[in-house]
Amino acid sequence: MYKPQIAIIGSRELSPSSLSLLNALAHELVSQGYRMVTGGLGTLQQTVHEGAKSNPQHTDCDTIVLLPGFDPEPAIGHADVIIPTGLDAYRNALVVNAEVVVAIGGGAGTLSEMAFAWQFNRPIIAIGKDGWANQLAGESLDHRQSSKIIDCTSSSVEEIVSQISNQIMNQYKRHQGIS
């Protein structure tokens, strides 16, 4: 059975409040029948996995990690499905190949992922108070889309999940190639 995938991207190291938000979000996303995809490094992916696993409805394939290197070690014990791509930063395009992208914090890697998501016509939801996600919340990156990055930087977990569901149900269309 296919479950919609939600890419969660952001800083390797996040504040305690951001980690708490991610943990609760991952827990609730499992309840709603979603899978989560991360880039696999740092506390973000560990927190997403812990939040998902804390939900009694968690299955053994609810968290997917796409690692930049060939070594699976960084994600062992912190993900259900581990894919060591060996693609380095190029794997960012794979990470955001999801129905919706949720961005929190972020430096250059997150900015790259947000740009790919934008080019792929993926809805991007910005949460948290730091980094590129916060800076680009409510903005349009260029002319490719008439929409903007969805600003959920002050939203509750329930509001974020509602926005994710809304994007999937009403506005989502698959990328058909760069034009």
Task: Indicate residue ranges for each PLM-predicted region.
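Generic N-terminal amphipathic, Lys/Arg-enriched alpha-helix
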Residues: M1-P16, L25-H27, S31-Q32
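Structural beta-sheet core signal
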Residues: A7-I8, T38, V65, A126
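Acidic/glycine-enriched connector segments
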Residues: N23-V30, G42-F120, G128-N134
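A short beta-strand-loop structural module common to alpha/beta enzyme folds
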Residues: R35-T43
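Short acidic-hydrophobic, aromatic-tinged amphipathic segments that line or gate anion-handling sites
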Residues: I82-G86, Q145-Q163
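Nucleotide-sugar donor-binding patch of glycosyltransferase catalytic domains
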Residues: I124-T153
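C-terminal amphipathic helix plus adjacent low-complexity
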Residues: I168-S179
